[in-house]
């Protein structure tokens, strides 16, 4: 049975998740995390895209990503193929690196963008036991860029969009994006 074709909207962000096969680790050390960013940089040179939140865990990654020029599937094929080749070559790994095709969910509104980005940034403190006590202490997440108001050398990372979303919906949320992320959800 053929796979269902994914919907692509060049104007919307998508929450993308990719997990290691059998939930195995696909990022084993700092060099692997760095290699993933080199892959993103390579993909950006081919196809322009924007990431407003990310979290790279040891066995999966989350991206809040928009691909305005090409269908998301084409972009993700480049990213996942390049990283898979890197990993297989480095570790002499055979077989499928990833569990299945990437998960992607269209994020239709600004409120949804805030909610999804919060979920992404809370990943390191939501594990049992938590990987870190504070979100800003996890080095492989975009949260520290928001917390410390720092810039990045990666042109595909954009931290202004979520701040603008929060400003436009500020009657519902705390005054800063980081406060919004740090508030314990009552669900």
Model-derived segments and their meaning:
Residues 1-53, 67-187:
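Short Pro-Cys-Gly-centered "Cys-loop" motif that presents a nucleophilic cysteine in a tight turn
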Residues 59-67:
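Short beta-strand->loop micro-motif that forms the acidic, two-metal-ion catalytic signature
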